[in-house]
Amino acid sequence: MIEFVYPHTQLVAGVDEVGRGPLVGAVVTAAVILDPARPIAGLNDSKKLSEKRRLVLCEEIKEKALSWSLGRAEPHEIDELNILHATMLAMQRAVAGLHIAPEYVLIDGNRCPKLPMPSMAVVKGDSRVPEISAASILAKVTRDAEMAALDIVFPQYGFAQHKGYPTAFHLEKLAEHGATEHHRRSFGPVKRALGLAS
């Protein structure tokens, strides 16, 4: 892994996404500028934290960060653009939503969206960069809450448990009940459930 050198600027934003793999719902992104004067203990990749810990950290991040913002791309945008381009768009929206313009942006992963300031992609950034860890927590808590809300409307699919990912249970219910308007029609299993696959 390439050694990560932290940029020598004051206002660094971290950006991460949640929800590229699910068959349903938006891809959700977050951008966070942390306050060096108000450190947050225990930041890590959201997937390595318990749900309870994520919820506590989410509130602390919102309270202590200099600026934070959420972005998203809806299922119809994912279907129109493809998941990669929709994710880049959602990241651009998260950065644009910051009320303080960052001097530098660190993106989790291996590619950066076009931004009006310098940026760098950091592989496994959600475990290596506190700003990206914070962004991953905000994005995951937000998307998980959306899946729990969708589960109330469509209880037969089990969205609260699998968060829209293509588990055996989700695929079984998709075949049984068909797709909701929140499913991504360009994704193979959804296409097949709708009889659109060639």
Swiss-Prot record:
PROSITE patterns: RNASE_H_2. It comes from Escherichia coli O1:K1 / APEC. It is an enzyme of class 3 (hydrolase). It is found in: Cytoplasm. Belongs to the RNase HII family. The gene is rnhB. Keywords: Cytoplasm, Endonuclease, Hydrolase, Manganese, Metal-binding, Nuclease. Endonuclease that specifically degrades the RNA of RNA-DNA hybrids. It catalyses: Endonucleolytic cleavage to 5'-phosphomonoester. The keyword Cytoplasm applies. The keyword Manganese applies. Its cofactor is Mn(2+); Mg(2+). One of its GO terms (cellular component) is cytoplasm. This is Ribonuclease HII. Pfam families: RNase_HII. A divalent metal cation binds at D16, E17, D108. NCBIfam families: PRK00015.1-1, PRK00015.1-3, PRK00015.1-4. GO terms for molecular function: manganese ion binding; RNA binding; RNA-DNA hybrid ribonuclease activity.
